[in-house]
Amino acid sequence: MRTPNSPTIAVVLKAAALALLVFRAAVACAETPAPDSVRIAGGHAIEWERPKLFDVDASGKKTTALRVPAALRRALADASSVAFPSDHLKRIDGTDYLLVVVNRSSNSRPTGYCGAGEEGTLYVLELRGARAVPRFSLPVQSCLDSVSLETDGGAQSPYRAITWRDAPAGIDVRWEYLAHGGATHRFYRFANGTFAEAEVPR
Protein backbone atom coordinates (compact mmCIF):
# COMPACT_ATOMS: atom_id res chain seq x y z
CA MET A 1 0.00 0.00 0.00
CA ARG A 2 1.37 3.39 -0.97
CA THR A 3 1.62 6.03 1.72
CA PRO A 4 1.00 9.67 0.68
CA ASN A 5 4.24 11.60 0.66
CA SER A 6 4.89 14.48 3.05
CA PRO A 7 4.19 17.31 0.53
CA THR A 8 0.75 15.81 -0.20
CA ILE A 9 -0.09 15.58 3.50
CA ALA A 10 1.08 19.15 4.03
CA VAL A 11 -1.16 20.41 1.22
CA VAL A 12 -4.18 18.58 2.64
CA LEU A 13 -3.53 19.94 6.13
CA LYS A 14 -3.15 23.49 4.81
CA ALA A 15 -6.39 23.19 2.84
CA ALA A 16 -8.22 21.90 5.93
CA ALA A 17 -6.86 24.73 8.06
CA LEU A 18 -7.88 27.30 5.44
CA ALA A 19 -11.40 25.82 5.25
CA LEU A 20 -11.69 26.04 9.03
CA LEU A 21 -10.62 29.69 9.02
CA VAL A 22 -13.13 30.52 6.28
CA PHE A 23 -15.89 28.76 8.24
CA ARG A 24 -15.04 30.64 11.43
CA ALA A 25 -14.97 33.95 9.57
CA ALA A 26 -18.39 33.22 8.06
CA VAL A 27 -19.79 32.39 11.49
CA ALA A 28 -18.30 35.58 12.97
CA CYS A 29 -19.86 37.69 10.20
CA ALA A 30 -23.25 36.03 10.71
CA GLU A 31 -23.18 36.32 14.51
CA THR A 32 -25.76 38.59 16.11
CA PRO A 33 -23.58 40.76 18.36
CA ALA A 34 -24.31 41.89 21.89
CA PRO A 35 -25.17 45.59 22.35
CA ASP A 36 -22.23 47.92 23.07
CA SER A 37 -24.34 50.23 25.25
CA VAL A 38 -27.59 50.43 27.20
CA ARG A 39 -30.12 53.14 26.42
CA ILE A 40 -31.37 55.27 29.30
CA ALA A 41 -33.56 58.37 29.55
CA GLY A 42 -32.94 61.61 27.63
CA GLY A 43 -31.10 60.00 24.71
CA HIS A 44 -28.24 59.00 27.01
CA ALA A 45 -26.61 55.58 27.22
CA ILE A 46 -24.41 53.58 29.56
CA GLU A 47 -21.08 52.44 28.05
CA TRP A 48 -17.89 50.86 29.35
CA GLU A 49 -14.55 52.46 28.75
CA ARG A 50 -11.75 51.08 30.85
CA PRO A 51 -11.82 51.27 33.77
CA LYS A 52 -15.39 52.53 34.38
CA LEU A 53 -19.01 52.60 33.27
CA PHE A 54 -19.97 56.00 31.86
CA ASP A 55 -23.16 57.91 31.16
CA VAL A 56 -22.76 59.07 27.55
CA ASP A 57 -24.95 61.80 26.04
CA ALA A 58 -26.58 61.77 22.60
CA SER A 59 -23.47 63.31 20.99
CA GLY A 60 -21.27 60.52 22.35
CA LYS A 61 -19.64 62.67 25.03
CA LYS A 62 -18.96 61.04 28.38
CA THR A 63 -20.76 63.07 31.03
CA THR A 64 -20.54 61.09 34.26
CA ALA A 65 -18.78 57.98 35.55
CA LEU A 66 -21.25 55.77 37.37
CA ARG A 67 -20.47 55.42 41.06
CA VAL A 68 -20.26 51.77 42.06
CA PRO A 69 -19.19 49.92 45.24
CA ALA A 70 -15.47 49.25 45.71
CA ALA A 71 -15.65 45.52 44.84
CA LEU A 72 -17.35 46.19 41.50
CA ARG A 73 -15.03 49.13 40.83
CA ARG A 74 -12.05 46.78 41.18
CA ALA A 75 -13.71 44.16 38.95
CA LEU A 76 -14.30 46.77 36.23
CA ALA A 77 -10.74 48.07 36.49
CA ASP A 78 -9.32 44.53 36.14
CA ALA A 79 -11.75 43.44 33.42
CA SER A 80 -10.48 41.96 30.17
CA SER A 81 -13.83 42.92 28.60
CA VAL A 82 -17.34 44.04 29.54
CA ALA A 83 -20.58 43.15 27.72
CA PHE A 84 -24.21 44.24 27.87
CA PRO A 85 -26.72 41.41 27.24
CA SER A 86 -29.57 43.88 26.66
CA ASP A 87 -29.62 47.35 25.06
CA HIS A 88 -32.33 48.64 27.41
CA LEU A 89 -33.07 48.96 31.10
CA LYS A 90 -35.75 46.92 32.81
CA ARG A 91 -38.17 48.80 35.06
CA ILE A 92 -39.52 46.67 37.89
CA ASP A 93 -41.72 48.14 40.61
CA GLY A 94 -40.66 51.65 39.58
CA THR A 95 -36.92 50.93 39.68
CA ASP A 96 -34.55 50.65 36.70
CA TYR A 97 -32.16 47.70 36.39
CA LEU A 98 -29.19 47.16 34.09
CA LEU A 99 -27.54 43.89 32.97
CA VAL A 100 -23.76 43.80 32.56
CA VAL A 101 -21.25 40.95 32.27
CA VAL A 102 -17.76 41.66 33.58
CA ASN A 103 -15.05 39.33 32.24
CA ARG A 104 -11.57 38.71 33.52
CA SER A 105 -8.78 36.73 31.92
CA SER A 106 -8.79 33.04 32.83
CA ASN A 107 -5.03 32.91 33.14
CA SER A 108 -2.30 35.43 33.77
CA ARG A 109 -0.09 33.44 31.35
CA PRO A 110 -1.31 34.05 27.76
CA THR A 111 0.40 30.85 26.57
CA GLY A 112 -0.98 28.70 29.40
CA TYR A 113 -4.15 26.61 29.51
CA CYS A 114 -7.13 28.92 28.98
CA GLY A 115 -4.68 31.76 28.41
CA ALA A 116 -7.05 33.35 25.90
CA GLY A 117 -10.19 32.40 27.82
CA GLU A 118 -12.35 34.47 30.14
CA GLU A 119 -14.29 34.09 33.38
CA GLY A 120 -17.53 36.07 33.23
CA THR A 121 -19.87 37.28 35.97
CA LEU A 122 -23.32 38.73 35.36
CA TYR A 123 -24.27 41.73 37.50
CA VAL A 124 -27.74 43.20 37.82
CA LEU A 125 -27.32 46.86 38.76
CA GLU A 126 -30.02 49.06 40.22
CA LEU A 127 -29.64 52.56 38.80
CA ARG A 128 -30.06 55.48 41.18
CA GLY A 129 -29.10 58.56 39.22
CA ALA A 130 -25.31 58.43 38.87
CA ARG A 131 -25.07 55.45 41.24
CA ALA A 132 -25.27 51.78 40.28
CA VAL A 133 -25.94 49.32 43.10
CA PRO A 134 -25.42 45.56 42.50
CA ARG A 135 -28.56 43.61 43.42
CA PHE A 136 -27.54 40.22 42.04
CA SER A 137 -24.48 38.53 40.59
CA LEU A 138 -23.94 35.15 38.95
CA PRO A 139 -20.94 33.46 37.26
CA VAL A 140 -22.15 32.78 33.71
CA GLN A 141 -19.12 31.62 31.75
CA SER A 142 -15.77 30.05 32.53
CA CYS A 143 -12.99 28.52 30.51
CA LEU A 144 -11.47 26.95 33.62
CA ASP A 145 -14.74 25.35 34.79
CA SER A 146 -16.10 24.50 31.32
CA VAL A 147 -19.14 26.79 31.47
CA SER A 148 -20.35 28.35 28.22
CA LEU A 149 -23.42 30.41 27.35
CA GLU A 150 -25.66 29.35 24.48
CA THR A 151 -24.70 30.71 21.05
CA ASP A 152 -27.34 29.05 18.84
CA GLY A 153 -24.66 27.17 16.98
CA GLY A 154 -22.45 30.24 16.69
CA ALA A 155 -25.20 32.41 15.18
CA GLN A 156 -25.36 34.81 18.11
CA SER A 157 -23.17 36.39 20.76
CA PRO A 158 -23.17 34.29 23.95
CA TYR A 159 -24.43 37.32 25.86
CA ARG A 160 -27.70 37.08 23.93
CA ALA A 161 -28.37 33.99 26.06
CA ILE A 162 -29.11 36.35 28.98
CA THR A 163 -32.52 38.00 28.58
CA TRP A 164 -35.11 39.92 30.53
CA ARG A 165 -38.49 38.31 31.12
CA ASP A 166 -41.68 40.31 31.64
CA ALA A 167 -44.17 38.08 33.43
CA PRO A 168 -43.08 37.07 35.93
CA ALA A 169 -40.31 39.68 36.02
CA GLY A 170 -36.86 38.18 36.01
CA ILE A 171 -33.89 36.97 33.97
CA ASP A 172 -33.55 33.93 31.72
CA VAL A 173 -30.06 32.45 31.31
CA ARG A 174 -29.34 29.66 28.83
CA TRP A 175 -26.10 27.71 28.84
CA GLU A 176 -24.78 25.63 25.98
CA TYR A 177 -22.77 23.71 28.52
CA LEU A 178 -22.85 23.93 32.29
CA ALA A 179 -20.22 21.76 33.99
CA HIS A 180 -21.67 18.30 34.70
CA GLY A 181 -25.04 19.43 33.37
CA GLY A 182 -24.88 19.96 29.61
CA ALA A 183 -27.37 22.39 28.07
CA THR A 184 -29.26 24.22 30.83
CA HIS A 185 -31.96 26.91 31.11
CA ARG A 186 -32.48 28.71 34.42
CA PHE A 187 -34.76 31.52 35.52
CA TYR A 188 -33.98 34.10 38.21
CA ARG A 189 -37.13 35.76 39.46
CA PHE A 190 -37.30 39.25 40.93
CA ALA A 191 -38.42 39.20 44.57
CA ASN A 192 -37.90 41.62 47.45
CA GLY A 193 -35.39 43.81 45.62
CA THR A 194 -33.17 41.01 44.34
CA PHE A 195 -33.21 38.00 42.01
CA ALA A 196 -33.39 34.36 43.03
CA GLU A 197 -33.49 31.11 41.10
CA ALA A 198 -37.02 29.84 40.54
CA GLU A 199 -38.84 27.33 38.38
CA VAL A 200 -38.67 28.22 34.69
CA PRO A 201 -42.12 29.58 33.70
CA ARG A 202 -43.97 27.59 31.04
Language-model-detected regions and their locations in the chain:
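N-terminal signal peptide c-region/cleavage motif recognized by signal peptidases
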Residues: 25-27
